Curated annotation (Swiss-Prot):
GO terms for cellular component: cytosol. This is RNA-binding protein Hfq. RNA chaperone that binds small regulatory RNA (sRNAs) and mRNAs to facilitate mRNA translational regulation in response to envelope stress, environmental stress and changes in metabolite concentrations. Also binds with high specificity to tRNAs. Homohexamer. Belongs to the Hfq family. GO terms for molecular function: RNA binding. Gene3D superfamilies: 2.30.30.100. The lineage of its organism: Bacteria, Pseudomonadati, Pseudomonadota, Alphaproteobacteria, Hyphomicrobiales.
Length: 84
């Protein structure tokens, strides 16, 4: 029996940038800057690809994720974008 629950913002964001192949800049907690496209993610890590090379990045090491272009994941006025 499946329970229909809304996806969290983190998963919604990562899935959106993965599906749309949005280039990202990821800053780690130690200040390192990584760039690439998300090809896969789970609860603990993100697989980032750039120039034919993949990097497995643990989420606990990520400080900030910046898309390379503006993105709109929700329609204006969409209730999915509001915490409830």
């Amino acid at each position: 029996m499946a329970v229909d629950r809304p996806q969290n913002l983190q998963d919604t964001f990562l899935n959106f940038v993965r599906k749309n192949k949005v280039p990202l800049t990821i800053f780690l907690v130690n200040g390192v800057k990584l760039q690439g496209v998300v090809t896969w993610f789970d609860n603990f890590c993100v697989l980032l690809r750039r120039d034919g090379h993949s990097q497995l990045v643990y989420k606990h090491a990520i400080s900030t994720i910046m898309p390379g272009a503006p993105i709109q994941m929700f329609e204006p006025g969409d209730e999915a974008g509001h915490a409830g």
